[in-house]
């Protein structure tokens, strides 16, 4: 039986909140089978839980939020959610003493390291996957995203940014998903933004944690970070990272082929909701052994060590 995963032990880290610029303590806790992914704000009394759920997602100018029925929110969940998807973590409680997850370096890599440091444990309960049975597509003007049936998980993402720092050959990225591929090719890609936008937001008391330490910053002509880019095509790789996190908001790894053109958090979420709303378009599946499991989801030794 392919089993659900959680952490072996509690781990903690600190970072800066993108919105407030204040120190945030992040605690990751193991959770029993069928708990799912739970985000928890401990700065509120009593603490408030936000289960990962496609219908709770709100896209803001700066990040992805989860919002409950009382309009209480937790922000900047997307990069940690991508790390959970990358390592196939089914059950976890994520605590922060703030209204947001720390931005760290603007990628998912610090969260991957934290999860691997905690160790990954298998629970004696079958892991559920969402398998795509029918093609589902959503559009917004010239932007679109779709899922097609496929026995694995592939992603093909195209951006269309007209900027001297972004070469035309660096606007598309495609990959066969696996934990190894995610960690090596995607997890280190950072979020990006224009210096003028960051300065404008900070003048209004927003994005106070935004800096060269947590994003690729560009002006009209070039990348301003002293160290430059981590990959020639880091921009599109980060958009794929975002998509992996957005699509894991259902709390399950997805078996299917994802293709997108100029998509963002809102359209990725719209696609996920469109799939889940169409009963005949998907099904839950479990697997008895590795022989049945799509190659995309076979755990490398680095994960289940």
From Swiss-Prot:
It comes from the Bacteria. Catalyzes the hydrolysis of UDP-3-O-myristoyl-N-acetylglucosamine to form UDP-3-O-myristoylglucosamine and acetate, the committed step in lipid A biosynthesis. Keywords: Hydrolase, Lipid A biosynthesis, Lipid biosynthesis, Lipid metabolism, Metal-binding, Zinc. It comes from Salmonella paratyphi A (strain AKU_12601). Zn(2+) binds at residues 79, 238, 242. GO terms for biological process: lipid A biosynthetic process. Belongs to the LpxC family. Its EC number is 3.5.1.108. Pathway: Glycolipid biosynthesis; lipid IV(A) biosynthesis; lipid IV(A) from (3R)-3-hydroxytetradecanoyl-[acyl-carrier-protein] and UDP-N-acetyl-alpha-D-glucosamine: step 2/6. GO terms for molecular function: metal ion binding; UDP-3-O-acyl-N-acetylglucosamine deacetylase activity. Pfam families: LpxC. GO terms for cellular component: membrane. It catalyses: a UDP-3-O-[(3R)-3-hydroxyacyl]-N-acetyl-alpha-D-glucosamine + H2O = a UDP-3-O-[(3R)-3-hydroxyacyl]-alpha-D-glucosamine + acetate. Its cofactor is Zn(2+). This is UDP-3-O-acyl-N-acetylglucosamine deacetylase. The keyword Chloroplast does not apply. The keyword Lipid biosynthesis applies. The lineage of its organism: Bacteria, Pseudomonadati, Pseudomonadota, Gammaproteobacteria, Enterobacterales. The gene is lpxC. InterPro entries: Ribosomal_Su5_D2-typ_SF, UDP-acyl_GlcNac_deAcase, UDP-acyl_GlcNac_deAcase_C, UDP-acyl_N-AcGlcN_deAcase_N. The active site is at residue 265.
